From Swiss-Prot:
Catalytic activity, as annotated: [protein]-with a C-terminal TM segment(out) + ATP + H2O = [protein]-with a C-terminal TM segment(in) + ADP + phosphate + H(+)
Annotated CDD domains: RecA-like_ATAD1
Residues spanning the membrane: 16-32
Gene field: ATAD1
GO molecular function: ATP binding; ATP hydrolysis activity; membrane protein dislocase activity
UniProt source species: Bos taurus (Bovine)
Binding sites annotated in the UniProt record for ATP: G133, P134, P135, G136, C137, G138, K139, T140
SUPFAM superfamilies, per database record: P-loop containing nucleoside triphosphate hydrolases
Membrane topology (UniProt): Single-pass membrane protein
Location(s), subcellular: Mitochondrion outer membrane; Peroxisome membrane; Postsynaptic cell membrane
Gene Ontology cellular component list: mitochondrial outer membrane; peroxisomal membrane; postsynaptic membrane
Protein function: Outer mitochondrial translocase required to remove mislocalized tail-anchored transmembrane proteins on mitochondria. Specifically recognizes and binds tail-anchored transmembrane proteins: acts as a dislocase that mediates the ATP-dependent extraction of mistargeted tail-anchored transmembrane proteins from the mitochondrion outer membrane. Also plays a critical role in regulating the surface expression of AMPA receptors (AMPAR), thereby regulating synaptic plasticity and learning and memory.
Record text on subunit structure and interactions: Interacts with GRIA2 and GRIP1 in an ATP-dependent manner. ATAD1-catalyzed ATP hydrolysis disrupts not only its binding to GRIA2 and GRIP1, but also interaction between GRIP1 and GRIA2, leading to AMPAR complex disassembly.
Protein's recorded name: Outer mitochondrial transmembrane helix translocase
Length: 361
């Protein structure tokens, strides 16, 4: 018969240590098992790990040291662009001299000469800048050139970065955008096609999307309370009318990037063809007169088509053995005329397609 005293006796020191050891092993195995299961069912785990590695690499490239980042800030940091790796300068942008001058005065100067304006609230850089106008007119180029000239860290924010399947994660990512930008200031948060992200709110918006937008705007407002903060949200859009009125209020500095006029088109053509093999008799003013309604990207594509005509003629007129001996002839006026006609037909066809869809709707 077992006496009751046997069950009530105190554990020995070795038994206590053994029990603690077994509980520790059990807890560790349970933790890592659950963690492995969560990682296994998360389809974005691999992308998150790769994003973290990319973020750490970028942070080293831009010379950021002794700055601790959270998991969410690391996800945003993967979209950092090193200003030294941005090969866009003002000299790469033609026909927008007035816009460039205004940007230098209102955005770049207050950042580069901060000590001159620290006692004035009126002369601080704006917290929001909107670039709007037709597609292909250089809005993204201007944003990159602004960041490079001002020496700002450039966060190329994609709206998809802020969406997460877990409830509440999108708000944390939105908060990480601003906390990271503040840690890395001076910095520019650039949102291309901002109308797709911060468009007019309506009752049909998903709850998570509405909460994320509200969080984003609330944090954006926080930049205004700290006048020494050098964080700028810069957006580009083709449809400013679709932007929420609250967003427009937060972007008081706006620049209309319109389609280039005659002199602007001539300047753009000179820039595009500056280092190309072009016949000296080509009249770029005449080409500019024939390209009314062309955007900057249209002009570049037109020049590319003209150069390809020379390449195609060279390939068709020579044998494989003589390719190394001959040279491709320079681009001539007639090549540019043919490329213009091709581009006009393409634009007309696209316009007719749009009209057809409108009529069907």
């Amino acid at each position: 018969m077992v006496h009751a005293e046997t069950f009530s006796r105190p554990l020995s020191r070795n038994e206590v240590v053994g029990l603690i050891f077994r509980l520790t092993i059990f807890g560790a195995v349970t933790y890592f098992t659950i963690k492995w299961m969560v990682d296994a069912i998360d389809p974005t785990r691999k992308q998150k790990v790769e994003a973290q590695k990319q973020a750490e690499k970028l942070m080293k490239q831009i010379g950021v040291k002794n700055v601790k980042l959270s998991e969410y800030e690391m996800s945003i940091a993967a979209h950092l662009v090193d200003p030294l790796n941005m090969h866009v300068t003002w000299s790469d942008i033609a026909g927008l001299d007035d816009v460039i001058t205004d940007l230098k005065d209102t955005v770049i100067l207050p950042i580069k000469k901060k000590h001159l304006f620290e006692n004035s609230r009126l002369l601080q850089p704006p917290k929001g800048v909107l670039l709007y106008g037709p597609p292909g007119c250089g809005k993204t180029l201007i944003a990159k050139a602004t960041a490079k000239e001002a020496g700002c860290r450039f966060i190329n924010l994609q709206p998809s970065t802020l969406t997460d399947k877990w409830y509440g994660e999108s708000q944390k990512l939105a908060a990480a955008v601003f906390s990271l930008a503040i840690k890395l200031q001076p910095s520019i948060i650039f949102i291309d096609e901002i109308d797709s992200f911060l468009r007019n709110r309506s009752s049909s918006d998903h709850e998570a999307t509405a909460m994320m937008k509200a969080q984003f705007m609330s944090l954006w407002d926080g930049l205004d309370t700290d006048h020494s903060c050098q964080v700028i949200v810069m957006g580009a859009t083709n449809r400013p009318q679709d932007l929420d009125s609250a967003i427009m209020r937060r972007m008081p500095t706006r620049f209309h990037i319109n389609q280039p006029a005659l002199k602007q088109r001539e300047a753009i053509l000179k820039l595009i063809l500056k280092n190309e093999n072009v016949d000296r008799h080509v009249d770029l003013l005449e080409v500019a007169q024939e390209t009314d309604g062309f955007s900057g990207s249209d002009l570049k594509e037109m020049c590319r088509d003209a150069a390809l005509l020379c390449v195609r003629e060279y390939v068709n007129s020579t044998s494989e053995e003589s390719h190394d001996e001959d040279e491709i002839r320079p681009v001539q006026q007639q090549d540019l005329h043919r490329a213009i006609e091709k581009m006009k037909k393409s634009k007309d066809a696209a316009f007719q397609n749009v009209l057809t869809h409108v009529c069907l709707d």
